[in-house]
């Protein structure tokens, strides 16, 4: 590694099992650094880290730091994410011992400087677009390094250390840390107001994106997003699924169903070829086109790209089919923003009452089982949630997943139910008081041939996993 200020350091990750933290830990360990961590959970990422020889403490206790600092002293660096609170006992002990503490974004910024980096940012589609880029480059024999916010099917991991020149990484806008990154290519999928615990309005988010664009040598962005047109510089490389004239890269859909999307592909207004992708939905065409645009901007030949877009797979928890339970198909999805719900339901609707579907059997109804994520997001976007949930045939709401936030008075799933009914008075909608009651409610309110679409960024995925394990 070049420009390496951490060559003799030991990195200790507080909360190492998270999708972002575990990826960084994997890459550092495979590049020869000493790595340890702590996490209260026990998930597949923890097992993968242990397989790499990484020592993981089961509790986030002050004694972890005391034990490590006895051996490492000035060589020990503590890594945290924005999810780690200041009152965390392990972090408090690190401060007490005056240890060097870095945010995960500082580690990623360091890794980005080592390779030709393609950074994916935006409100929605980051993980899917990153996965597609990583898959294309992997299959095109580029052997990239990747740090992704989801499990990439091609590598069956959220991180991979390759021998090629490319590094693919997500640049998280949620806490503004993406302004630390100096990328070779910065890709922007879209931006709209979210993370209202950090951004007061859309203008503050746009200003952060503008800072990010100034740090990247090339910007590749989605022309179909009005906010990106405000945020991006004049020399932006644009892609679009709506128009091809005066656009650098375009894919205009010709056939779209629940099984495939066929589109006419253009470069700089000139028709090149048709492309077929196995990921239904306009948003997935957009994600795929963004990935193609990034690869082409990195001088990958289109002939090395096209053969691989027809067999793409989404990362885990992106419309992930889990199985069939009592005649009901189970799909798990990460959607937790109104726009993500809209796009996912639009995609699901393509699979209702048809055999042209990526699902194994035709479904009659879409049943959304939604776990709102964060009180602040629910409060600030409740009107949009209420509108977009109306595209389902039946809705079941769980309690709000706090993600570490304190409750906000009056912001509950019952409130979201009332707002949704005001927009959609004929929509069957139910709430459950506790997540453990959910299976019983699903059993009572749904029927055979329903598509059970579990949505949310919290622990709702555990319910879909539990039901899938009951499949005989």
Curated annotation (Swiss-Prot):
EC annotation? 6.3.2.8
- List keywords of the entry alphabetically: ATP-binding, Cell cycle, Cell division, Cell shape, Cell wall biogenesis/degradation, Cytoplasm, Ligase, Nucleotide-binding, Peptidoglycan synthesis
Gene Ontology biological process terms in this record: cell division; cell wall organization; peptidoglycan biosynthetic process; regulation of cell shape
Where can this protein be found? Cytoplasm
Record keywords: DNA repair included? Answer: no
The entry's cellular-component GO terms read: cytoplasm
InterPro entries (alphabetical): Mur-like_cat_sf (IPR036565), Mur_ligase_C (IPR004101), Mur_ligase_C_dom_sf (IPR036615), Mur_ligase_cen (IPR013221), Mur_ligase_N (IPR000713), MurCDEF_pg_biosynth (IPR050061), UDP-N-AcMur_Ala_ligase_MurC (IPR005758)
Annotated pathway? Cell wall biogenesis; peptidoglycan biosynthesis
- Reactions this protein catalyses: UDP-N-acetyl-alpha-D-muramate + L-alanine + ATP = UDP-N-acetyl-alpha-D-muramoyl-L-alanine + ADP + phosphate + H(+)
Q: Which domain of life is it from?
A: Bacteria
* Class in the EC hierarchy, top level: ligase
Quote the record's binding site residues for ATP.
Answer: 122-128
Family note: Belongs to the MurCDEF family.
Q: What does this protein do?
A: Cell wall formation.
Q: What is this protein called?
A: UDP-N-acetylmuramate--L-alanine ligase
Which gene does this sequence derive from?
A: murC
